[in-house]
C-alpha cells in the first residue's frame, strides 16, 4: 500500500551503501540480478560478489532473516556465466548467513514480466515467429506466489533452498502456442537451429560492444542462448511451494489480464467485427 514501502538507492557493489540501507532492518530480501555480462554491474559484481556482500553485512548488523532470490536450474547449467555467478552467489549467501532462505524461481510472470510480454510483442512482427530452444521446458511461476514464499522467509517460518515452479510445464514452443492463442494471432513458428541463435546473439552482442553500450542488445545474448540448453523446471525431491503450503497459480488464470494489449485490436478485439 502507498506509504508502506519506501524506495531508497543502494549500490550493491559498495559495503557502505549496502550497510546504510540494511542497518536497523529485521529482515532483508535480495532480489537483485542482471543479464549484463560487461560494465560495472556485470554478472560477477552483482550476482556473485553482490549477493555475498548483502549476506555478510546483514549478518554483521544482526539482521534476523535473509531471503535471497536466485534462479531455477542454476545448479544444473554448467555453460552460462549467468548460472555460474548465481551459483557463486548462493554459496556466498550460505557461507555468510547459513539460515538464509534461497528461492529458485522459474521464469516469473506478471503484469510487467519479461517472458510472456516479450514473446507476445514479437508475435506482432512479421509473417512468421522465429524461435530458438523450442524444446527447452519451462515452468513459469506467478510473481505473487514468489512473493508469498519470500514473506515466509521474512517472518522466519521457513529457511533453506526452495525450487519454485508453476503448476504447468511446457516446452518453449508449447508456451508460444499459448501466447499466440491469447493474443489472437495465427502464424507459423520457425524453430531455428541453435547455431543460428549463437550467430545472431554474437552479432547483437558485438553491436552493443562496438557502440559502447549505446545500442543495447535487448533481444538475446550469447549467454542466454547457452541457458536455453538447460530445462527450467523443478527437480524431483526439491523443496517446493507444496512444502510452504502455497498453491501455485496457472499462467492462463493471469496472462489474459495484460496480454490483451498485443491483440490486433487490443481490448476491443472481440467486438471488432
Segments and roles (model prediction):
Residues 60-65, 97-98:
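A short helix->loop->beta-strand "cap" motif at the edges of active sites that frequently abuts
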Amino acid at each position: 500500500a502507498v506509504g508502506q514501502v519506501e524506495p531508497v538507492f543502494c549500490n550493491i557493489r559498495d559495503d557502505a551503501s549496502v550497510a546504510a540501507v540494511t542497518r536497523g532492518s529485521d529482515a532483508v530480501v535480495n532480489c537483485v540480478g542482471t543479464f549484463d555480462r560487461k560494465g560495472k554491474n556485470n554478472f560477477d559484481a552483482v550476482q556473485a560478489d553482490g549477493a555475498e556482500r548483502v549476506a555478510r553485512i546483514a549478518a554483521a548488523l544482526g539482521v534476523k532473516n535473509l531471503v535471497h532470490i536466485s534462479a531455477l536450474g542454476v545448479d544444473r547449467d554448467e555453460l552460462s556465466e549467468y548460472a555460474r555467478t548465481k551459483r557463486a552467489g548462493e554459496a556466498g549467501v550460505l557461507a555468510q548467513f547459513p539460515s538464509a532462505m534461497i528461492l529458485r524461481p522459474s521464469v516469473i510472470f506478471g503484469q510487467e514480466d519479461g517472458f510472456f510480454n516479450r514473446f507476445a510483442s514479437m508475435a506482432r512482427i512479421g509473417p512468421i515467429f522465429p524461435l530458438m530452444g523450442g524444446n527447452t521446458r519451462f515452468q513459469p511461476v506467478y510473481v505473487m506466489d514468489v512473493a508469498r514464499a519470500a514473506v515466509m522467509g521474512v517472518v522466519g517460518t521457513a529457511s533453506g533452498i526452495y525450487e519454485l515452479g508453476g503448476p504447468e510445464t511446457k516446452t518453449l514452443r508449447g508456451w508460444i502456442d499459448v501466447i499466440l492463442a491469447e493474443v489472437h494471432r495465427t502464424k507459423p513458428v520457425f524453430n531455428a537451429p541453435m547455431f543460428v541463435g549463437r550467430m545472431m546473439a554474437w552479432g547483437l552482442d558485438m553491436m552493443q560492444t562496438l557502440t559502447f553500450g549505446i545500442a543495447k542488445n535487448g533481444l538475446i545474448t550469447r549467454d542466454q542462448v547457452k541457458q536455453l540448453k538447460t530445462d527450467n523446471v523443478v527437480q524431483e525431491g526439491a523443496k517446493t511451494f507444496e512444502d510452504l503450503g502455497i498453491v501455485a497459480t496457472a499462467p492462463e488464470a493471469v496472462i489474459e489480464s495484460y496480454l490483451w494489449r498485443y491483440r490486433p485490436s487490443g481490448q476491443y478485439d472481440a467486438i471488432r467485427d
